[in-house]
Amino acid sequence: MSAQKPGLHPRNRHQHRYDLAALCQTTPELTSFLIRTPAGEQSVDFANPQAVKALNKALLAHFYAVTHWDIPPGFLCPPVPGRADYIHHLADLLGETTGSIPAQATILDVGVGANCIYPLIGVHEYGWRFTGSEVSDAAMSSAQAIIQANTGLSRAIRLRRQKDPAAIFTGIIHKNEFYDATLCNPPFHDSAAAARAGSERKRRNLGQNKDDALNFGGQQQELWCEGGEVAFIKKMIAESQSFRRQVLWFTTLVSRGENLPPLYRALTEAGAVKVVKKEMAQGQKQSRFIAWTFMDDDQRRRFITRKR
C-alpha cells in the first residue's frame, strides 16, 4: 500500500495508494464496490460511477472531515487528489509574496459546481474563506446542501448565483470586495458533440455502459462552451481587467498545453504584470494552471498588508 503516485504536490494527502480498509471503515458503503484486479489486488470498480462517488465520499470524510457529501446524477464527480493539488499549488503561489501561506485568504471559485470540491478542500487544509459562483440552480442547490449538512462550513463558504451566463466576475465580485485569488476549472470542449465524443472515449476506456456514462458525466456548463476552453479563458482575462485592484491573483486550469500560447498573448494584450504557470501531474495525467496579476511586487505586498 506504500507505492507513491508520481507528481503530486508534497503536501497532498493522497501520495500513496488508497488505504481501502480505512476508507471502508469511514464510509462502509464503499465496501460493496471493491473488486479484485487480475493481479489479485483489491481495488475500487472505477467503471462504476456509483463506486467512484462512494470513493469520493470516503476520501472527503476520511481526509477532510466532510461527513455529508452527495451530488445529483448527471453532474461531474471530480477526482479528489487532482483537485487537492490545485489548492496546494495555489497556496504556494499565495505564499510567495510574504514567505508564508496566508491563513485568512479569501478565494473565489468560479463555477463551484454541485460537488463544491475546491472550497471543501481549501477550508480544511488552510482555513480559507470561499465564495463560489454558479450559473446552474441545480448545482447551487447541491453545493448549498453540502455546506449546510457539515458543521462550520456555512461560516467559511458562501455561494452566489451568476445570473448572466455570459459573465464570469461581473455580478459576483461586489464593490469594495477583495480576493487573494480566483480559481476555475473551465469548460473543456467547444461543442456538445465534442463533449459527447469525449465522454464516449472515457466510457469505452473504463468499460462502462451508456447508462453509467450518463450518470456522473457532467452537465453542459461543466463540459463545454462556445469556442471551448480558450474562448472561455480569454473572456476571463478580458473581464479580469475590470477587477485588477480587487483580486491579487487570477488563476484557471488549462487542460491542454497547446492552448497556452493564445492565452499568453491575451494576457500580454490585457496588461498583466506577471504571469505564472504551475505544472501538475497525477500519474500519467498532466495538467497545469496559469495565474496572472495586474500588480507589481510592491503593490502585491501592500494589498496583502491592507487586506489583513
Curated annotation (Swiss-Prot):
Which of UniProt's keywords are assigned here? Cytoplasm, Methyltransferase, rRNA processing, S-adenosyl-L-methionine, Transferase
Q: What is its EC number?
A: 2.1.1.181
Give me the reactions it catalyses: adenosine(1618) in 23S rRNA + S-adenosyl-L-methionine = N(6)-methyladenosine(1618) in 23S rRNA + S-adenosyl-L-homocysteine + H(+)
InterPro entries of this UniProt entry?
METTL16/RlmF (IPR010286), rRNA_lsu_MeTfrase_F (IPR016909), SAM-dependent_MTases_sf (IPR029063)
Q: Name one GO biological process term.
A: rRNA base methylation
Q: Which Cys-Cys disulphide bridges does the record give?
A: none
User: Major location, coarse class?
Assistant: cytoplasm
The GO terms this record gives for MF are: 23S rRNA (adenine(1618)-N(6))-methyltransferase activity
| Localization of this protein | Cytoplasm
Q: Does the keyword Thylakoid apply?
A: no
* Chain's role: Specifically methylates the adenine in position 1618 of 23S rRNA.
Q: What is this protein called?
A: Ribosomal RNA large subunit methyltransferase F
Q: What lineage is on file?
A: Bacteria, Pseudomonadati, Pseudomonadota, Gammaproteobacteria, Enterobacterales
